[in-house]
Amino acid sequence: MYCSMPDGEVENKLQDVIDRKILDTRRVFFSEPVTDKSAADAIKKLWYLELTNPGQPIVFVINSPGGSVDAGFAVWDQIKMMTSPVTTVVTGLAASMGSVLSLCAAPGRRFATPHSRIMIHQPSIGGPITGQATDLDIHAREILKTKKRIVDVYVEATGQPREVIEKAIDRDMWMTADEAKDFGLLDGILFSFNDL
């Protein structure tokens, strides 16, 4: 008797096996925009690794165009609370909130692959903005607070003066991995995971 599974089930089972194998190596891949869902998925995986083997290193691989600041800082805060040392590795792209996530590792643990790109900029509000003047003023003050938090992260991570960071993020600032290293966003360029 022959029993076949629908293609979707086969793909899902294969994806589960791949995800399990990767998690067994204590690697978490974040290869999507930063959303509430992607942040929650990453946090669950990170905490699974933390709880199953506390204090053992975790590699957080980032390839993200950025996205939600709040969701990104949720991941950031969780990583900072763990006992397991986290190493970040940018591969492909870490833009906007993705670049902030790449800095959640302790100094000496922030890397990128040779052809990666990093983009930093100030936060923005998407879509048309409508509402009463008072509400718009509240939103404007909130985005300025968010900008300050992001500037604080970049200043602490890079050691650059606040004025340099504020000027750098005034518009999109694109960097190669080497340029990001020179700017202080990375500690090194990673040519092999064996180098970790």
Curated annotation (Swiss-Prot):
Q: A single GO CC term, please?
A: endopeptidase Clp complex
- Protein location: Cytoplasm
What CDD domains does UniProt report for this protein, alphabetically? S14_ClpP_2
GO process terms (BP)? protein quality control for misfolded or incompletely synthesized proteins
Any one GO MF annotation of this record: ATPase binding
Identify the PANTHER family for this entry: ATP-DEPENDENT CLP PROTEASE PROTEOLYTIC SUBUNIT, ATP-DEPENDENT CLP PROTEASE PROTEOLYTIC SUBUNIT, MITOCHONDRIAL
Per UniProt, subunit arrangement is:
Fourteen ClpP subunits assemble into 2 heptameric rings which stack back to back to give a disk-like structure with a central cavity, resembling the structure of eukaryotic proteasomes.
By what name is this protein known?
A: ATP-dependent Clp protease proteolytic subunit 2
The gene designation is clpP2
